[in-house]
Amino acid sequence: MQFEEAYKEVYEIVRPKYKLFTAGPVACFPEVLEIMKVQMFSHRAKEYKQMHVDTVERLKKFLEVEKGEVLLFPSSGTGVMEASIRNGISKGGKVLVTIIGAFGKRYKQVVETNGRKAVTLEYEPGKAAKPEDLDEALKKNPDVEAVTITYNETSTGVLNPLSELAKVAK
C-alpha cells in the first residue's frame, strides 16, 4: 500500500494528459527529479567506470547471471538491435527473425539495412511464437547465424515463451 500511495503522489505532480502504454515516458518521484539536477560526469571519467562496474555486478546478481556477460547500451532499443547485428553477424549472414509485432518487424528492417539476410517466422498480431514452428524454421535454414526473439512485444501486448524458444534456438 505504501508504494501505491507514493505513486499517487507522483501522479498528482505530473498528471499526464494521456495514459501511455509504452516503456516511457514515466512519472518520476521527486527524489529522482532532484538527483537529475546534478551535473553528469563524462563516460570517460573514472567515476563513470566505477559506476559501470558496480551496475554490471548488481545486474548480474539481480538477473542471476552465472555465466556470460551483462551488456549496457547507452542507446535506444533500435541501437541495441543494430549493434547486435553489426557485431554479431557476418556480412551477408542470415538471421532468423521472429515477428509477433512492430519490434520484430523493426529487427527485420535492421538486419536488412545492415547488409544481412532475414528469414522470418511471422505471426498475426496477438499471437506468440511457437517452439515447434521455430524448430521447423531452423531445420529449413540450418545456416542461420542467429535468431531474434522479442520477449515482450509491447506493440501487441504479447509475451513470447522465451524459455521454451531459447531451448529450441540453442
Segments and roles (model prediction):
Residues P74, T98, E122, T148-Y151:
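Short beta-strand segments
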Residues I35-A83, A102, R106-E112:
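Conserved N-terminal alpha-helix of the aminotransferase class I/II PLP-enzyme fold
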Residues A129-K170:
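Active-site phosphate-binding strand-loop segment of PLP-dependent enzymes
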Residues R106-K117, E124, E132-A137:
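Active-site-proximal loop->helix
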Residues I85-K91, T113-N114:
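Alpha-helix C-terminal capping segments
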Residues Q2-K46:
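N-terminal "arm"/small-domain region of PLP-dependent enzymes with the aminotransferase-like
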Residues P25, F29, L33, R44-H52, ...:
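Generic structural signal for well-ordered, non-membrane alpha-helical segments
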Residues G88-K105:
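Conserved PLP-anchoring active-site segment centered on the Schiff-base-forming lysine
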